[in-house]
Amino acid sequence: MDFNKLYVLAQNNLFTDITIILKDESNEITLNLHKNIIYSSCIFFEKLLTSFKEKESSKIILNVPNAIIVNDIIWDFYGQKIKSHNYPEWKYFIESYKCFDYFGMNTDKKKLYKLIVEPDGFDELMDFIDLIGYDENAIEVIFNNLPDDYDLSKFSHELLTEMLSMYKKNLVQIITRNEIIVLNDFFDGTIRSTEHCINSPEVILFCASNASKIVTFDGHNIRILESNNSILLSDDSTVSDAGTILHISHSQNKNVLVILYEYRIDVWDVLINKLIASFRVPFIKKLSCSYDGSQLVYVDNNNNMIVKNILSEEIISEINLQNLPEISNNFCIPELILETNTQDLSEIPNNLYTLELKSEPDQSIDFIKSNFQHNLDNLDDLNNLDNSDDLDNSNDLNDSNDLDDSDDSNDYNNLNYDLNNLEIICSSNNEIFENVSTHYCIDVNDCNHIDNINSLNLQSPIQDLSDSLSPIDYIDSSNLQSPVQDLSDSQSSTDWIVSPNTQSPVYYLSKLDGSINGEKLSDALSIENDSISDNSDNLNNSDNSDDLDNPDNSDNLDNSDYLLEYLVNTDKTNYMFNLTYSIHTDKTNKRFNLENPYEQFNFINKFCLLYINNKVIYFIDIIDKKIIHKETCRRNIVNMRCSPTGDSIAIIDSEYIVYIYKLVTDSNGFLCYPIVDYCILVRDLFLPTKIEYSSNGRYLVFDDDGLSINLYDIEQLEMTNEFELFCDSKIIVDITFSENYCDELINRLNNALKKIEQKYPN
C-alpha cells in the first residue's frame, strides 16, 4: 500500500467518507479521512465506528487534550511524520502522552524519567504527574527538576513525607561481586539491607543511578538485570565481528555503559536499555567516560588522546601526548617493586632470582642475563650484591652445589639492588648503544630450598621507553623463565592464571592449585595472542633456538607476536598478585605498547581533562590542547575521582593517603589552576581502596578494604559516619552514592512539612 497516495487523497478530499473535527481549549482542526484507515490504525476509532452512535455519522466532533498533537497522530496513520508544533521536548512529551492516553494507545513512559523541564514549566509537570500517579520514578523526576525557589508547601503532606523518605533511602550502595548492600538512612543510623544477590558465575559491575538496574558480566556475556527481566547486551555470537571484550567502563553517574572490543566501541544507555552509539576504533590502550556519559576520551596506539562526542561521534579534540613537552617521560619506570607474601610462596623456592635485561635497538633482540644468588645464611652477602664483579662470575652463581648450603629457617626483608650497574647493552654487531631503553623481568628459578624474602626493591634509572617501541622480528622465548609459561601446561602442580579486573586497567596474576582447565593465555589476557597458546610446544622447545637465530627462517618467526613481561606485587589482604606492567605488540603494526596501571584519565568538565601517569597529575585543556598545570606527587596514584560539580578532585596514593585538590575556574568553567586544599592522613585509621563523591561534591565515601564504609565531610574536614560491613571475605567492586543528597533540600522539605502541619494540625 502506498501511504503517500492515501495522504494525497485525504488532502484533496478524494474517496473520503468521514470528517473528524478536533477541538481543544484554543484550537479547532477539520480533517477529511477514510474510515477504513482510521479503523485499522487505532482501537479508539474501531470501537467508535462500530459500537457507538457515531457509527452512522459522517461527521464526528472530538474534544481532545491537544488538537495539534492529535492532528499529527492521525496523519501518522497515513505514514506521515508531521510536526505541527514548536513545543520544547518536555512539553511535547507531556502533551503527546495525554493524547495517546485519550486514544488508548501505548507510549514509552520511561522517557518521563529523563525529562528536563524549565523552571516556568514545573507546575505543568506537577499537574501531569498528579494525573498519571506518583511512584518512585515520578518523584525522582520531581527531584531532578525542582526549582531552587519553589514553594514546597504547595505539595501535599503525603508527597512531602514520601519525598523526604525517598531522599534518604539508598544513600550509599556497596557493590560486591555478587550482591548489592544498601545502606539506608546512612546519616541517622546503620541499617543494612541486601538486594540483588546473584548466585551464579556473573559478577556485578555496577548499579544504575536510580538503583533499579544492575549490569553484570560473566567473562563472555554482559547483561542488564531489572526486576525479573534480563537483557543481554553482548555475547560471543552477537559481537563476533567486534572481537573479544577488552575493557568495560561506565560514566560516573552510572547511567552510561561503555564496552571496548578489539575493533569497536559500543555505548549503552542503561536507564532505557538502548544502544546509543557504536563506532569502530583503532587499537586503544585506555579510555574514560565523562560524568554524564556525553563524552569519551581514549588513547590509541600512537599515543593520541582523542576526545569524542558519543552521540554525534564528532571528534572534539585530538592531542598527541608525546608532543606535549611537559610529558617527556610518559613511559618511565622509575621504580619497580616485587613484594611476596610468605604464605603464598609455600611451594615456590625463591633464594635464586634471575634478572634479565632486554632491548630493541634494531631488528634483533639481544639478551644479557645475570643471575644473583642470595645466600641468606650470611647477611653480609647482601651487601655483595652491589659489587659488579659478582655479575661476571656466572659460573659460580649457577653452581648448583652452592645452593645446598642455604638455610631454610632464615627470613630477611627488603632485599634491595640498584640496576644502574647493568648498563651494558649490545646489538648483534657488538655496538654499544647510548640511551637505549630497557625493561626488566624478575623470575624465580627452581632450587632445593625455600627462603622467605618479603620484598625485593629494584631502583631502575629513569628512561623514556617511547623510543624503544620499534618493530621486532622475534623474541627468544626460551630465555623467558616466567611463571606465565605454566599456562600452557594445565598439569602443572602450581599454575598461574591472568584475569582482567573490569573496574580498572590493572590485571591480576593469581596462583591456583591444580589445573587451569586448559584456559588459553590469549583468553586470559583478552588480547590477540593465539600464537603463544597454539604453539606453546614450539615456543618452549629449546631445540628450536637455532631456527630463531637464523634470519632465513623468517617465516617461522610468527610464533612470538607478543612479548609479555611481569612484575608482580602482592595485595596482602586479598592474596592477589598485581600485574604492574605488561608490554605487547599490535599484530598489525608490530609495535610495542606499554600498559601502565597507574595511567588514568578523567573529565573534570567539558573543557578540561585530568591525566595521571604514575606520580604525575596533568591538567589538560581540551580546547587549546595544552597542559594547564602539572603536579608531581610523592607516590604513585592508585585511584582518583573528580567532583561532579567540577570544583575538586580526590586521589589516593600507594600509601593510602587521600589528597583533595581544590580547582579554581573562571566564569566560563575553564580551569585556572589547582591547589592542594588538604590531605587526609587515613593510613592509621583504615585503608581506603575505593572512593566516591556525593553528587553535590560535599561528601566522600571511602572503602576500608572491604571492612567498613567511611563518610568524610569535605566542608567540615571530618569523618561523619562509619558503617561496619562485616564482609571481610568480599571484594568491593564499586560504591554508588545517592545522586540527590543535599542538606539544604532536606531542610526545605522539613520546613514545608512543619508549615503544613501547623496550618492543618489534624
Curated annotation (Swiss-Prot):
Residues 390-411, 532-556 are annotated as: Disordered. InterPro entries: BTB/POZ_dom, Quinoprotein_ADH-like_sf, SKP1/BTB/POZ_sf. Residues 532-543 have a biased composition (Low complexity). Keywords: Coiled coil. Gene3D superfamilies: Potassium Channel Kv1.1, Chain A. Residues 390-410 have a biased composition (Acidic residues). It comes from Acanthamoeba polyphaga mimivirus (APMV). This is Putative BTB/POZ domain-containing protein L272. The keyword DNA damage does not apply. The keyword Chaperone does not apply. Residues 737-762 form a coiled coil. Belongs to the mimivirus BTB/WD family. It comes from the Viruses. Residues 16-86 form the BTB domain. It holds the Pfam family BTB.
